Amino acid sequence: MFSRLTGVSLRQGLTVQKRLFSYARPLFNSSGSERTGSGSRQYNDGARAGAEYGYTGTRIVPKLSTFYSANPHHEAHIDNLEALLRKYIKYPTVQVEERPSWLSLQEYALIGGGSRLKSTQYKQLLFMLNRLNSIDPQLVTDEISNTLAKYHKKTKLQPQRDTLKQLDEFGRSLAIGRRKTSTAKVYVVRGEGKILVNDRQLNDYFVKMKDRESVMYPLKAIDSVGKYNVFAMVSGGGITGQADALMHAIGKALVAFNPLLKTRLHRSGVLTRDYRHVERKKPGKRKARKMPTWVKR
């Protein structure tokens, strides 16, 4: 059947196949000798045999064993951590209360593949770092410590600045408060409770009772009404905005007299600026949110 289809006998086909396999043999054997038909020429080493026939180049070995992966640098880090984890997998672990600050995604990208790094790969790194960090501190070796130290966030130790407000040579505390487009600059000093706003009495400048109560609210929060003199300069915005800006400034100025009052003033809300603004009008609407009446026909 084979001879009918190909015109070649089975014995002839096997002979040709053997010849093809013999041609496909390597030029040099493992001992460095040349294969030449019935005999072979002997060489002391394979390099000499290759040099005679022009085979002088050698294959370049990649520096990383993960060279052919999608992200070689990240995979190299993961391989090192996995090897370390397998080595100390039987070590007991403890519940870590405070985890160290590891490198952020952007910082790790500098050594972990750059734009090739994915968020899932970064989460994989954090999982392995936290697992190694959970080993009992009494059993942690230098190898583990040195490896984890490579992934700690580098923080520059800066001297802590004194953020407490200080009184000037006249015993005054200066502060600036803002609300919308209004700004208030106040000087607070211990006294009999006198309050001047732009060289005018409080009742003359703020006609509305609500605005006057807003100005006095920081003093009421610490039970100090009538114990401090306030000299304020306000500008910009409307009357209510100026009153809220003045309240913000007085609250900040009172902290300089007694830092322990900061918690109470903060809970009262006078130390936090109110960033709310009037929402702008939108096209096609009557106001910011109000829509015109819909008519079917």
UniProtKB/Swiss-Prot annotation:
One of its GO terms (biological process) is translation. InterPro entries: Ribosomal_Su5_D2-typ_SF, Ribosomal_uS9, Ribosomal_uS9_bac/plastid, Ribosomal_uS9_CS, Ribsml_uS5_D2-typ_fold_subgr. Coiled coil: none annotated. Its main location: mitochondrion. Keywords: Mitochondrion, Ribonucleoprotein, Ribosomal protein, Transit peptide. SUPFAM superfamilies: Ribosomal protein S5 domain 2-like. GO terms for molecular function: RNA binding; structural constituent of ribosome. One of its GO terms (cellular component) is mitochondrial small ribosomal subunit. It is found in: Mitochondrion. It comes from the Eukaryota. Residues 278-297 are annotated as: Disordered. Belongs to the universal ribosomal protein uS9 family. This is Small ribosomal subunit protein uS9m. It comes from Kluyveromyces lactis (strain ATCC 8585 / CBS 2359 / DSM 70799 / NBRC 1267 / NRRL Y-1140 / WM37) (Yeast). The lineage of its organism: Eukaryota, Fungi, Dikarya, Ascomycota, Saccharomycotina. The gene is MRPS9.
